[in-house]
A protein has these predicted regions:
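Conserved Rossmann-like nucleotide-cofactor binding loop
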Residues: 43
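Nucleotide/phosphate-binding catalytic cleft detector across ATP-hydrolyzing
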Residues: 1-40, 48-166, 173-196
């Protein structure tokens, strides 16, 4: 608030983050009953239904992009005895995404790490299957939160959400396969905001 006044604002009003997100996305709530926003950021996930009257319901969790990176680092260490850094884990997460098909998945991504056996640098080719194994428990908890919010949403608003889709924002929103997975789990289409971060 002080920062806004310092740069010349005459009046400041604090608003809930989900409402700010709706405004920032340019969504017109006067034309619809409500919108479901899933904000998966680096440090937390916030799932909110916002209507023209404010936040209808929401769910907050610590599931995040950072936890996903740590899960990938742990799976690589456990399976290959190789330590990789957070940047390498994020590269794997964004390159390979969340979905893989056991019969067709040939996507791989190479990253460098340190062998815990030889303590020497090594390069490793990681498949989408390995990344999915790391991300699945976190995604399960995120989708449990989405399901919980959907179940608490009034039918009139839910009809609008079904028609317009779920809006994905935050750094993890661009994860390959995420919007397709949202559709599979919720039976509602999802789209990534133009500027999700």
């Amino acid at each position: 608030r002080e920062a806004a006044v310092a740069v010349g604002a005459r009046k400041t009003v604090l608003i809930d983050q989900p409402i700010a997100a709706v405004m920032g996305l340019g969504l017109k709530l006067d034309r619809m009953q409500g919108v479901l926003i899933v904000d998966i950021g680096g440090g937390s996930t916030k799932i909110s239904v916002v209507s023209r009257h404010g936040v209808v319901n929401s769910h907050f969790s610590t599931e995040s992009g950072m936890l996903m990176d740590e899960a990938i680092m742990n799976v690589i260490l456990e399976k290959y005895h190789i330590r990789i850094g957070r940047k390498a884990a994020e590269t794997l997460k964004m390159a390979l995404g969340v979905e893989w098909d056991l019969n067709r998945d040939t996507r791989i991504c190479e990253v460098c790490g340190i062998s815990t056996i030889t303590e020497l640098p090594v390069k490793i080719a990681v498949t989408g299957e390995i990344v999915a194994q790391a991300l699945n428990p976190i995604l399960y908890r995120i989708f449990s939160g989405i399901t919980s919010v959907i179940q608490m949403t009034p039918p009139a608003i839910l009809g609008d959400i079904r028609e317009h889709g779920i809006v994905l924002i935050g750094g993890v929103a661009q994860l390959k396969g995420l919007k397709e997975l949202v559709l599979k789990v919720t039976d509602m289409k999802a789209h990534v905001a133009d500027h999700p971060s």
